[in-house]
């Protein structure tokens, strides 16, 4: 039996479910991905959580909590500014948001002691799991922001930090793809921890038990439900390992109905701009999906011409790398018919 080819992640599957062309453009063509301030702020927050999750840095953590300011430790301040400058989010507004969200995450049971002392606490627990046993066939890959393992209770607490401006909506609240993916990964990595639960912390919100809390706790997923998820993964794996340009035309976001559950899905994902650079009434650019319009880009390639990584700007390509200039024609659903 052949091995699964593509690594499945929650974000990859969600992209496929959201829009078949977006999946094709990002994962098959391999166009460069446009970052944004929100994602870049999140990258920095996650970095600080990983750094301060090390037991040997507990004194640094304690000082920050005592002062209620992540900049009370100069090395942390320098680290934040270093990466904020690199990612283009070093203006005052972005820095304040980074400070606030980082402190919020540090203040909330950062070492997982509310359920007792964990036998193991891991920051950025990665997983790369291949199953090909005749019944199931899939390859899942990703990482868990924080994982706490409580040996006596045989309990695994899975924690994910979110820096988005909204909490989950619609089915994501109770039937969450990340929750299933992480729970399955922990079952494979630590099978002796039979009780597993996920919590998502939205750092722009208060992390308390109020009505508008940024804490979303998921009900534990049963082994039967995880087995059902494995059947789904097997079907998705087969589909994506044979994904073609014809499949890319099968489920355009623009052809889907508008969402009724307040989720960011369907045509909303395309954006309402009718041409590149269209401005809103206030003079700011209208948002549009990064796959919507045509553009040129650059791809580094290996000796066989296989694409390694893509870039918007030629100046960003590492020195000495072989590369090609390529053209992306834009999303067919938004191209003007001649």
What are these regions (language model features)?
Residues 1-338:
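RecB-family 4Fe-4S metal-dependent nuclease core
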């Amino acid at each position: 039996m052949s091995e699964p080819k593509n690594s499945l992640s929650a974000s990859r599957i969600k992209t496929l479910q959201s829009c078949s062309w977006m999946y094709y453009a990002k994962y098959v063509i391999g166009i460069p991905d446009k970052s944004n301030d929100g994602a870049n702020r999140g990258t920095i927050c996650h970095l600080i959580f990983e750094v301060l999750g090390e037991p040997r840095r507990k004194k640094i953590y304690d000082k920050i909590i005592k002062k209620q300011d992540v900049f009370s430790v100069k090395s942390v301040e320098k680290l934040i500014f270093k990466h904020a400058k690199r990612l283009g989010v070093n203006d005052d507004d972005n820095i304040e948001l980074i400070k606030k969200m980082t402190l919020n995450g540090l203040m909330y049971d950062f070492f997982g002691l509310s359920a007792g002392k964990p036998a193991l606490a891991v920051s950025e627990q990665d997983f790369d799991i291949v199953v090909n046993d005749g019944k199931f066939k899939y390859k899942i890959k990703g990482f868990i922001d924080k994982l706490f393992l409580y040996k006596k209770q045989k309990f695994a607490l899975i924690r994910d930090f979110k820096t988005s401006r909204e909490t989950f909506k619609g089915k994501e609240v109770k039937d969450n793809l990340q929750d299933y993916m992480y729970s399955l990964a922990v079952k494979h990595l630590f099978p002796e921890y039979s009780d597993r639960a996920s919590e998502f912390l939205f750092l722009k919100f208060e992390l308390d038990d109020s009505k508008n809390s940024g804490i979303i706790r998921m009900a534990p997923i049963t082994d039967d439900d995880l087995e059902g998820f494995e059947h789904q993964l097997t079907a998705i794996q087969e589909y994506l390992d044979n994904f073609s340009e014809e499949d890319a035309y099968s489920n355009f976001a623009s052809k889907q109905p508008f969402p009724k559950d307040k989720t960011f899905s369907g045509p909303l994902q395309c954006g309402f701009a009718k041409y590149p650079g269209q401005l809103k009434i206030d003079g700011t650019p209208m948002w549009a999906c990064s796959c919507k319009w045509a553009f040129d880009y650059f791809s580094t390639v290996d000796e066989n011409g296989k694409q390694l990584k893509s870039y918007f700007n030629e100046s960003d390509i590492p020195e000495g790398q072989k590369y090609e200039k390529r053209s992306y024609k834009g999303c067919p659903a938004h191209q003007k018919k001649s």
